[in-house]
Amino acid sequence: MPIIIKDGGTQRDFTPHPEVEGAPAVCIDALDLGWKEGAYGLKYRVALVFYTGLVEKGPEGQNVQLTVAKFFNASFNEKSSLSSFVKQWMGQAYKLPDNDLEKLIGQTALLSIAHNATAARTYANIESIMKLPAAMADQAPPIPGDFVRLCDREDWPGPAPHPEMSQPAAAAVSAEKMPWE
């Protein structure tokens, strides 16, 4: 599902995922969002995206999968929210191989999703997560066949670079040859 940005810089209108307690879900994407400015300064951000099997009709009548995402600072420190979330989901003894978030794609979960409202819109947030019980394994939705990961989409520019590391366009292209060229 594309993330369309309006000219004003805010995201498009969307239907938040309905509030649910104990929804079987599957992790369908791990996003590398790059450097983002937040309330506590510049942080490297990642996200995990889940699909619960719910679909709505889009503006042109097409089926649109409803997804819900959880955003984190990219840190596996024992006190980080990402580390706590993965342990809550996979169990205290679980160690993510090579700290590779993509290894979580395809893993099932049981989610509790709640709405948080602001003056501008309503957001669906993952309030809790746990491993899907074996008795509910047949209720987990499959990853939709037409789903394309964000990093595989043609219109995705990639993670946001650190502002101090990006070069101005004029500096990137230099007509002057270096002595060794």
Model-inferred region functions:
Residues 1-181:
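Short beta-rich binding modules
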